[in-house]
Amino acid sequence: TFDVCYEQLFFVGGNWK
């Protein structure tokens, strides 16, 4: 889902929004 993609992207960046 879109949420998962967004979650992974932020996690990889190291900045949880």
From Swiss-Prot:
The keyword Hydrolase does not apply. Induction: By water stress. Pathway: Carbohydrate biosynthesis; gluconeogenesis; Carbohydrate degradation; glycolysis; D-glyceraldehyde 3-phosphate from glycerone phosphate: step 1/1. Keywords: Cytoplasm, Gluconeogenesis, Glycolysis, Isomerase, Stress response. It is found in: Cytoplasm. It catalyses: D-glyceraldehyde 3-phosphate = dihydroxyacetone phosphate. Its EC number is 5.3.1.1. GO terms for cellular component: cytoplasm. GO terms for biological process: gluconeogenesis; glycolytic process. GO terms for molecular function: triose-phosphate isomerase activity. Belongs to the triosephosphate isomerase family. Homodimer. This is Triosephosphate isomerase, cytosolic.
